[in-house]
Amino acid sequence: MGQFTVVSLGLLAVFLSLSGAKGDNCPANWISRNGVCNKLFPDRKTWLEAEMYCRALKPGCHLASLHRDSDSTVLAWYISDHFKGAGHVWIGLRDTNRKRTWKWSDRTSTNYFSWNQGEPNNVQDNENCVHLWAPSGYLKWNDEPCASLHPSICQYKL
């Protein structure tokens, strides 16, 4: 009877880990990083359209926010490896008041920046949204007019 109990508990542990009971699994086609799930959507949208699209996916979903170099590296690898030629990709950072005060759409703290050299430059006083800059391998950011059309990357917390 003792071996049966041990085997049963072992099978239960395997089943729970495969079923996602640990709470760290993202849906198919989403990637997991630092407690969040991300997915790139290749359809080109304005920044606001992209943010609204993310919000419609599920409660708490927004354009991606990045808070450390490792976040940038994981997303850069994901985009470069799976979406060749995606072009620039919207993230959730923007200057809503046009005062060069950058805020994430998910309202997390703005404690990390990865601007490309010379950015943000606010060309023609019209660049208030931020994308991952394709020529940098998606590691650096550029400010851009919010009406520009780009793919986007959505994110939600696990």
From Swiss-Prot:
**Can you cite an annotated GO cellular component?**
extracellular region
Q: Residue numbers of motif Mannose-binding?
A: 119-121
Q: Which Gene3D superfamilies match?
A: Mannose-Binding Protein A, subunit A (3.10.100.10)
Which cysteines does the record link by disulfide bonds?
A: 26-37, 54-154, 129-146
Q: List the subcellular locations.
A: Secreted
Q: Where does Ca(2+) bind?
A: 127, 142-143
Main localisation: secreted
Pfam family, any one: Lectin_C
C-type lectin domain span: 33-155
Q: Which UniProt keywords apply?
A: Calcium, Disulfide bond, Hemagglutinin, Lectin, Metal-binding, Secreted, Signal, Toxin
Report the SUPFAM superfamilies cross-referenced here.
Answer: C-type lectin-like (SSF56436)
Tissues in which the UniProt entry reports expression: Expressed by the venom gland.
GO molecular function list: carbohydrate binding; metal ion binding; toxin activity
Secretion signal, residue range per the UniProt entry: 1-23
Q: Which domain of life is it from?
A: Eukaryota
SMART domains, alphabetized: CLECT (SM00034)
State the similarity comment.
Answer: Belongs to the true venom lectin family.
Function description: Mannose-binding lectin which recognizes specific carbohydrate structures and agglutinates a variety of animal cells by binding to cell-surface glycoproteins and glycolipids. May be a calcium-dependent lectin.
Q: What is this protein called?
A: C-type lectin lectoxin-Enh6
